[in-house]
Amino acid sequence: MKILKNEYIRQSFITGLVVFALYLGITHTFHPFIVSGNSMQPTYHSGQIVTTITTYTQSDIKTGSVVIFKNNGKKLIKRVVGVPGDTLVIIDGTLYINGEKDDSEFAAIDVAGTLSNELTLKNNEYFVMGDNREADNSRDSRTFGAVSYEQIIGIVDKTIGER
């Protein structure tokens, strides 16, 4: 009888550990985020729900990654256009990265905002912009400057639905 009781306790403990590990894995690896506003159109629109990967290293954040970050207490979603070491400038509505004209998917949109002086990103800084880059459509690094690695909450993984 004592052997059965000890086996039951051992199995319960193992089951509890597995459940706890799954809980931690799910809640600390993936996090849902509801897109608000039109700054990321046409890629994402208001009301879409995206999942973010919240366990990542600095090398996982690349040019083109879409990230969720905190700025003045608000969570925002933007695309990374500049990574540590990059030099950026906006001249006549065109974004230049490391002296090269931005040729990304959203480069055809005239870039509003100012970055008339070259900005070289420090070791933990990222330059982020909304995909909807016309005037007043995106509050991003053109407005509030570079985003630090510590401000980034997660990297967008996929869209899972609508609110």
Placement of each model-derived feature along the sequence:
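Protein maturation boundaries and topogenic segments
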Residues: 1-75, 147-163
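Short, glycine/charged-enriched secondary-structure capping and boundary segments
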Residues: 65, 96, 141-144
